[in-house]
């Protein structure tokens, strides 16, 4: 994500399937989908796959945080809700206490598992139902977004993220604004970019979802891609950049660095 090239949408997206876009996945010797939504129209390289559901992996952290905030499980994004107790964890950066703000930046899985347990099954299920988040299925409360029980499509992701950008999800405006603050990836005088990545090593699938906001335009996006080797995880950022650049080349968006 650190080398993420960002783009501005300034024209409406035409509904359609662009075969040229699809070549980017082929060029990387993999399969996947990219879909964008401007609030009215969609564009995708593969609408069929864009409607196919997969585990959201760490992209669900966006909505895990939203449900927690809206239900008062945490007061705000700065409250320390997770305390590291010396247990074995996957990454060194996870060996520390966490707030929502710090945990989402580190994609700190143990912290979000603890958050889900604090939310509880009943409240979490109510949250998923309110969102119409994928198949809304919960298996075990602290693994359901990782173990393939919860499934969501790229189109559904793009829809939800566009609603989040507008504060139009069925949650308080305050909670939605707080969540957007912690997924803000980059900003300048022209635009703000909000994004979250995810990777499911059970099915070797990587995600990038988010939205771009300018003074008078918003574009949400979702990309998922099959990753044969975790060493090639950067493919997802490369693909996203190529897709957005393609819109730029077609005078749909303007790029900047």
What are these model-derived regions, one by one?
Residues 70-85, 171-176:
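Short, well-structured active-site flanking segments
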Residues 53-78, 103, 157, 221:
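Active-site SXXK
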Residues 46-51, 96-97, 105-112, 139-145, ...:
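Flexible glycine/proline-enriched surface loops and loop-helix/loop-strand junctions
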Residues 14-50:
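Beta-lactamase-like hydrolase cores
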Residues 92, 99-100, 112-161:
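Mid-domain, small-residue-enriched loop/turn segments at the edges of structured enzyme/sensor domains
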């Amino acid at each position: 994500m650190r080398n993420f090239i960002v783009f501005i949408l300034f024209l409406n997206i035409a509904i359609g399937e662009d075969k040229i876009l699809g070549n980017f996945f082929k060029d990387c010797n993999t399969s996947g989908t990219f879909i964008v939504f401007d609030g009215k129209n969609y564009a995708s390289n593969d609408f069929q796959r864009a409607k196919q559901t997969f585990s959201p992996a760490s992209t669900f952290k966006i909505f895990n945080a939203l449900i927690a905030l809206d239900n008062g499980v945490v007061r705000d994004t700065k409250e320390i809700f997770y305390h590291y107790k010396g247990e074995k964890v996957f990454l060194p950066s996870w060996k520390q206490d966490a707030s929502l703000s710090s945990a989402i930046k580190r994609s700190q899985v143990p912290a979000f598992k603890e958050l889900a347990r604090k939310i509880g099954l009943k409240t979490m299920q109510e949250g998923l139902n309110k969102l119409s988040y994928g198949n809304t299925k919960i298996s075990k409360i602290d693994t359901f977004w990782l173990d393939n029980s919860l499934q969501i499509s790229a189109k559904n992701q793009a829809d939800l993220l566009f609603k989040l950008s507008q504060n139009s999800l069925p949650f308080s405006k305050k909670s939605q604004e707080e969540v957007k603050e912690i997924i803000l990836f980059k900003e300048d005088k022209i635009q703000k970019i909000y994004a979250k990545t995810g990777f499911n090593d059970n099915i070797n699938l990587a995600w990038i979802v988010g939205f771009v906001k300018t003074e008078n335009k918003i574009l949400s996006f979702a990309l998922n891609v099959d990753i044969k080797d975790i060493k090639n995880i950067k493919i997802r950022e490369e693909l996203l950049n190529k897709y957005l650049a393609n819109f730029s080349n077609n005078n749909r968006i303007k790029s900047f660095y």
